[in-house]
Amino acid sequence: CGMVSTANYIGPVDDTDIFFSPDRIKAQLIWFTSGALEWRITKHSVTMPLKEMLISFEACSEVPCHRNDHKSDITMWINDVEVGTWTSPGDFGERRGQLNPPFWPLKNTQYGIWTSWRIDDKGTFFNGRQISSVTMQQLNIPSHPYISLKIGVKKDAKNVGGINLFGE
């Protein structure tokens, strides 16, 4: 596991304490093998009832250095409801990512796939294709004090291939 900013590594690699570092907010790339990251999103500016959620991010699998054919099952949960799983086809390298800092070695992961997740009254969709029947109503957003968004890799997934998350 690890994380980097635009300027340097944030703490030592393979030390989970970095996830509690105040510098974590500077991360531009986060990687780990299994587990999940959680974001707690305020509902103060949300008009209820919420009809749909759109969540987008760049991600790929994780393996030391990179391997373009290294699959990983990446799952999303909202308010602890599993909304769907996407199988990333690989951990991509060999050409420099557009926003990677100069210190980041070319042998490492360079870029991911832009993913778009939509949850509405018909189900959950990944890049326009339905991946589950979980709807907005099942997320029970009005009864929670915030919206919990988790992205990760289950320890018992078919393809436990880690995750790289790119961006702010």
Annotated model-derived regions:
Residues 1-106:
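Mid-protein regulatory/catalytic core that forms ligand/cofactor-binding pockets
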Residues 116-122, 150-158:
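Short beta-strand-plus-loop segments that form exposed binding edges in beta-rich domains
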Residues 50-52, 142-148:
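Extracellular Ig-like/FN3 beta-sandwich strand-entry sites
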Residues 65-69, 95-97, 128-136, 165-167:
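Low-complexity, polar-biased intrinsically disordered regions enriched in Pro/Ser/Thr/Gly
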Residues 57, 145-153:
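Short, hydrophobic/aromatic-enriched beta-strand segments in well-ordered soluble domains
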Residues 107-142:
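Beta-sandwich interaction modules
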Residues 44-47, 141, 157:
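Hydrophobic beta-strand core residues of beta-sandwich domains
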